[in-house]
Amino acid sequence: MFIHVGYYHLIFNCIIQLILGVLLEVVHKFWRVGIVYMFGVVGGALAHSVVDSHVALAGASGGVYSLIGAHIATVITNWDTMQKNWLDNPAHFFSSGVFRIIALLLFCVPDFGLSIHRRINHPEQPNGITPHLGGFIIGILIGIPVLRNLKVEKWEKICFWISLLAFIALIIIAVVYNVLCIRPKLCPNIYYSN
C-alpha cells in the first residue's frame, strides 16, 4: 500500500484517493469510507494472491479502485434520487448518476489501461493488475452494505444481503485458497523462493 511503481502511479493514486475519498466522506463519514478502503486493499491483495501471485504487487490500487466501486454502489442505490430533474439544471447534471459514472470511467480506464500496458510491454518487471479488479469488486460489494443510503427501498434491502454474502464468500474462498496452497505440489504454477 505504501510502495508504488513510478511517479504516475503514486500521483494518480493520491489524486483519486483525495477526490473520491473526500466526496464519499462528506456524505458517508470517514469511518465508513475507511472500512471500504481497507477492505479494498485486502481484497485486491487477496485477488492478486489467488490469480497472479508470481508477479510483484505494489501500490494502493486495490483501495483506490474500491473507492471507485463504492461510488458505483452509491450511484446504484441512489439512482432515483440522483436522476431527479438532472437535465433541468446544470448543477443537477453534475451530481447525476450518469455524469458520475462517465467521470469515473474517464478516471479508471486510462489507469487500468496503463497497468495492462506495463504488464504486457515490460515482462522483465511484471506488475499486478488483479488488485484493480479485486478492489473494484470489493468496493461495490462492501459499499452497498457499509455506505449510507438516502432512501432505502425493498430491492435495496435484498441487494444489501446479496452483496454482503457475496463479499464474505469471496473473502473466505480467497483465504482458504491461500491456506491450502502453502505447499508447492498443490499449486505448481506458483514460484516459491527459498
Q: Which ranges hold each PLM region?
A:
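Transmembrane helix-loop-helix
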Residues: 1-71, 78
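Beta-strand segments within the central parallel beta-sheet cores of soluble alpha/beta enzyme folds
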Residues: 35-38, 84-88
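A sequence-composition feature that detects small, non-aromatic residues
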Residues: 45-47, 56-60, 70-73, 91, ...
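Interfacial segments of multi-pass membrane proteins
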Residues: 70-77, 142-146
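Non-transmembrane, extramembrane segments of multi-pass ion/lipid transporters
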Residues: 80-82
